[in-house]
Amino acid sequence: MILSWKDVLSQEKKKKYFINIIRFLKKERLKKIIYPDQKDIFNAFFLTSFNDIKVVILGQDPYFSKNQAHGLSFSVPKHVTIPPSLKNIYKELNTDFKKEHIFHHGCLESWANQGVFLLNSILTVESGKPKSHSNIGWNIFTDKVISVINLYKNSVVFLFWGSNAQKKSHLINRKNHYILKAAHPSPLSAYRGFFGCKHFSLTNKILLKTKKKPINWFLI
């Protein structure tokens, strides 16, 4: 069965809480700087079709500094300096595959185009104020997103880095999907279990086992 995001989420966008989120953002943008730009909030959904999802990497909320957030977890536009967490992701990627690849930018759109759904739990943030939009209803929406992936997809690999992401584990049926957990790649926690997790090679092994094309993580 081929499903689109519209098929599985159209009713959600009609619900009162979702309408309230959109109204709130419209008002906030009149007086404050909100990231990402309105056009980029749902980029993860535009770049990875529901039918193509093979992997989910769950982030927290968007980057809260100018020009960084563009709707994909951990990713930044090509012209922006690579943030510390993403540098650590690249470091683990090289270690995992025993490479010394030089990454010239932090845009992960090529991952998204290969079926890696780069979702944040919270989809917007006020400039300079991390987690400022954590209570406006986004968690209801992203819980629903994870739930429909769990319900309608098979053998998806969920990469949950850090305790916030791991709280979503209860939404997933482990009989039908795979969950890989590690510490968050932030410099504050990467040495507590993110480095050495080998999630990228493990993910590809699972994809091969389930007869899916592995991700070319170095295609950036």
From Swiss-Prot:
Catalysed reactions listed for this entry: Hydrolyzes single-stranded DNA or mismatched double-stranded DNA and polynucleotides, releasing free uracil
Give the matching InterPro entries.
UDG_fam1, Ura-DNA_Glyclase_AS, Uracil-DNA_glycosylase-like, Uracil-DNA_glycosylase-like_sf
Q: Name one GO cellular component term.
A: cytoplasm
Could you say which EC number(s) this protein's record lists? 3.2.2.27
State the Gene Ontology terms under molecular function: uracil DNA N-glycosylase activity
Task: Give the UniProt subcellular location, in the record's own words.
Answer: Cytoplasm
Does DNA repair show up as a keyword for this record?
yes
Keyword hit for Chaperone: no
Q: Which residues form the active site?
A: D61 (proton acceptor)
Which keywords does UniProt give here? Cytoplasm, DNA damage, DNA repair, Hydrolase
Q: Which GO terms describe its biological process?
A: base-excision repair, AP site formation via deaminated base removal
Q: Which NCBIfam families match?
A: PRK05254.1-1, PRK05254.1-2, PRK05254.1-4, PRK05254.1-5, ung
What HAMAP family does this protein's entry cite? UDG (MF_00148)
The Swiss-Prot or TrEMBL record describes its family as follows: Belongs to the uracil-DNA glycosylase (UDG) superfamily. UNG family.
- What is the documented function of this protein? Excises uracil residues from the DNA which can arise as a result of misincorporation of dUMP residues by DNA polymerase or due to deamination of cytosine.
PANTHER family in UniProt:
URACIL-DNA GLYCOSYLASE
Record-given protein name: Uracil-DNA glycosylase
- Native organism: Buchnera aphidicola subsp. Acyrthosiphon pisum (strain APS) (Acyrthosiphon pisum symbiotic bacterium)
**Gene name in the database record:** ung
